[in-house]
Amino acid sequence: LARMFPFYKSMAPDALDIVMLFGVITLLAAGLIAVVQDDLKKVLAYSTVSQLGYMVAAIGSGAYTAALFHLWTHAFFKALLFLGAGSVIHAVHSNSMLEMGGLRKVMPKTFATFIIGTVALAGLPPFAGFFSKDEILASFNHEGEITFFFIAVLGAFITAFYMTRAVSLTFLGEYRGHGHPHESHNLMTTPLLALSVFAIASGWVNICLLYTSPSPRDDL
């Protein structure tokens, strides 16, 4: 879509509104589906679809650089979350969050890095997701798409909600599963620590406003 933007701009500008509409619908619908999932990996999978909706909507608003920026930051914190989920599943031998809980004490590295990924995905500063998601919201505001702007903001709150729910069911409270979970080997936790750095710092590349510019749709 980003590569085809010049074509849409010159030949079919009305198609950009359709692209933006489908992106906004996707980010909201996938986020709502993630709220009701009990499988940890499914939560992250639908979350990925929701974030792709943000990227598609950004392209529709003309902010294709912001979309690619979000693709860049999202790659790091979502990889961190999926690897963290893998570490948890390896420990408890189940994907269901209903059979987890209380893992914060026995899996401190996994817990800490999962929190970093969660905060980055929720878009809180100074984590990576804040910078890229903020550019997308700014593009809606710049284009005067106030309805889409508030839907995207609602999507951000939904993201924070389902990830807070996932953290609570997985790491807090009492352990509801079977066996004796333990922290994963360093071969699994070292990549988590490395990705945590990028989940925090990958958004800082936009401090010089590399991805911030007037919308290419201004001259349509």
Feature map (PLM): residue ranges:
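Hydrophobic transmembrane alpha-helices and their helix-loop junctions in integral membrane proteins
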Residues: 1-192, 196-204
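Conserved small/polar residues in nucleotide/adenosyl-binding loops
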Residues: 211-216
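N-terminal low-complexity segments that are often proline-rich with Ser/Thr-Pro
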Residues: 219-220
